[in-house]
């Protein structure tokens, strides 16, 4: 199967899988308490996937590419001049490692700061409304969806970049990693929007935009890459960088928007009696379970 066919099939599978997993909370009628529990579970999934799946996968993608390149270079060097170039190789290897450490931190921070700026810009536009609290809540919903869409788009770029390497194993690993967190993210997004009181039709639109983001961007990335840019892309470890950037956006959405909203602390600072009690024991268990599920799945995926 050629690269274009495989990327098309992977994109279609991503779209369907993401949309179906997001529809589940809409298809089942939950009571108020069960909806809160599902939302808490979704928040746990968002946090767990950011920390246990996306960041490790991004770091792994970075180091895998550099280690493969080093292994290839060493093979070439042994064939040509083993003794003369040994010192140069070790220096280049150390330089690569220092670059990688910088990539990890910079990518994560840029993703987080990007979402922080998007959040602030969205909030400043909303503050002119008559009811600032309602405006803040609306901004929270938009920012949550936008953050996950940006995250999904970065995932799409990662998959497109992986497809351009013409290595089927790399494509499948990136696809599995993306689906591992896209399905829970779609579930988490929809349950959060339901908890926030959005109409079902609008939730479906939000979900569709989120589901489309990664497949569309993966196709565009793959089609937009020429041979020369493919080579340049492999040099700067684009797959790993894109995944780490998306992890930064994901962490912001999970920790700054979804968790406070679920915990009753939200952006609202009104002295609300219901909000002050926080999470019940069952909800805390659901939150911890949500955090642990991606961890267990990622351990299974690594083996």
From Swiss-Prot:
Major location (coarse): Golgi
Q: Where in the cell does this protein reside?
A: Golgi apparatus, trans-Golgi network membrane; Cell membrane; Cytoplasm, Perinuclear region; Mitochondrion
Give glycosylation sites per the record.
Answer: 29, 237
Work out whether the entry's keyword set contains Repeat: no
A GO molecular function annotation here is: androgen binding
Ordered alphabetically, the record's keywords are: Cell membrane, Cytoplasm, Glycoprotein, Golgi apparatus, Ion transport, Membrane, Mitochondrion, Nucleus, Transmembrane, Transmembrane helix, Transport, Zinc, Zinc transport
A Pfam family: Zip
The record lists the catalysed reaction(s) as: Zn(2+)(in) = Zn(2+)(out)
List the GO terms this entry assigns under cellular component, sorted alphabetically.
Answer: mitochondrial membrane; mitochondrion; nucleus; perinuclear region of cytoplasm; plasma membrane; trans-Golgi network
Keyword Transmembrane helix, does the record have it?
yes
Show the stretches that span the lipid bilayer.
7-27, 35-55, 102-122, 142-162, 172-192, 206-226, 240-260, 282-302
The protein's topology relative to the membrane is: Multi-pass membrane protein
- Which Gene Ontology BP terms does the record give? bicellular tight junction assembly; intracellular zinc ion homeostasis; regulation of cellular response to testosterone stimulus; regulation of vascular endothelial cell proliferation; zinc ion transmembrane transport
- Record-stated family: Belongs to the ZIP transporter (TC 2.A.5) family.
Q: What does this protein do?
A: Transports zinc ions across cell and organelle membranes into the cytoplasm and regulates intracellular zinc homeostasis. Participates in the zinc ions efflux out of the secretory compartments. Regulates intracellular zinc level, resulting in the enhancement of AKT1 and MAPK3/MAPK1 (Erk1/2) phosphorylation in response to the BCR activation. Also functions as a membrane androgen receptor that mediates, through a G protein, the non-classical androgen signaling pathway, characterized by the activation of MAPK3/MAPK1 (Erk1/2) and transcription factors CREB1 or ATF1.
What protein name applies here? Zinc transporter ZIP9-A
Q: Report the source organism.
A: Xenopus laevis (African clawed frog)
